């Protein structure tokens, strides 16, 4: 089982960061790698089971299904159903935690998956951890002035 992980401190209160990332259909509003997002079938974007269709900046497409969302816990989990990444059985969680010192937010994004093909595991772990997860955190930090 392969793993990807990134974490970051964002200089904004957890409520503001959660408000920015909570909209499951809003990834294109804050992640630089995403050009467009739509929810399939007209379902509410916070309904567990809804599927978002993402168009990447390079034209690639990914379909992801919402598995869990918690406003109280400030996190959501999702699975990739299909896309260009060399992965299978992909499950990820984006989680925020309150930092009381300075009223900041600790953000953590992690995933487990099977590399497909297996020899692409290190490459997939690096790309997901750095380009996808850390790339999103860098954009959030810039948005919040960090």
What are these regions, as identified by a protein language model?
Residues 6-8, 62-68, 90-98:
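Hydrophobic/aromatic beta-strand elements that line small-molecule binding cavities or substrate pockets
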Residues 50-57, 77-83:
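Short beta-strand segments that buttress and anchor functional surface loops
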Residues 79-93:
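Mid-chain, well-packed structural core segment of small domains
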Residues 106, 112-146:
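A conserved amphipathic terminal alpha-helix motif
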Residues 17-21, 27, 52, 66, ...:
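Hydrophobic pocket/interface hotspot
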Residues 1-44:
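Hydrophobic ligand-binding cavity/cleft-lining segments
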